[in-house]
Amino acid sequence: MTAGALVSGDVEDMRVSRVTISDVTFAADLSGALFWEEQRLLVVSDLHLEKGSSFASRGVLLPPYDTIATLGRLAAVISRHDPRTVIALGDSFHDRTAHERLSAEDRDAVAGLQSGRDWIWISGNHDPMLPRDLGGTVADEVAIGPITFRHEPTGAHGEIAGHLHPKARVSARGRSMERRCFASDGMRAVMPAFGAYAGGLSIRDAAFAKIFPKNGFVAHLLGDRRVHAIAASRCY
């Protein structure tokens, strides 16, 4: 599906639940995860666990429930897809000591999510030195077939990355809607942040132009019930 095909008709007719990158088709989950069914591989990005406690240490008080909320959402998406492998695509922890602030219950929750499956932590800019005591394996990037998984996008073909926390705003039927989104041109993709407090960056930011030339990409917005594919040129 091309961006040109997406700009005709009503926004409500542009609904998709699949994203194709370098001829590999992924299920785009409303949670912000991608699932590669053939590989039984689930990918999530930018969990930013313990962001609330990180802010609290600097005097910015947020409700201290982001980690439990994020892990709960992750448990739900794992239950839906039953992956053989999970890749956490960097910035899983908000800072270098965030893992030390996990409660015993949160550590048990992580162990439960890892049970019976392979788990890969990709290092990110927030967590370049990932802990070795939380199970799973640690890598800077992982290549499977034509797809390379890394945290920071380079614009390479076959790349799935995170880091930028894409979101998009669109108007339809007199209403404005801003949502997290996958950004993809079919050759590469940037995933939305999964974490409860992760926030987002507009796809109209110059950072995306470096990855997707001429705005020739699609924003796959996470709606209430399904994913909506909308040409980036229609977003603001």
Question: Which residues are covered by each model-predicted region?
Answer:
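Extended recognition/assembly regions associated with phosphoester-bond processing machinery
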Residues: M1-Y236
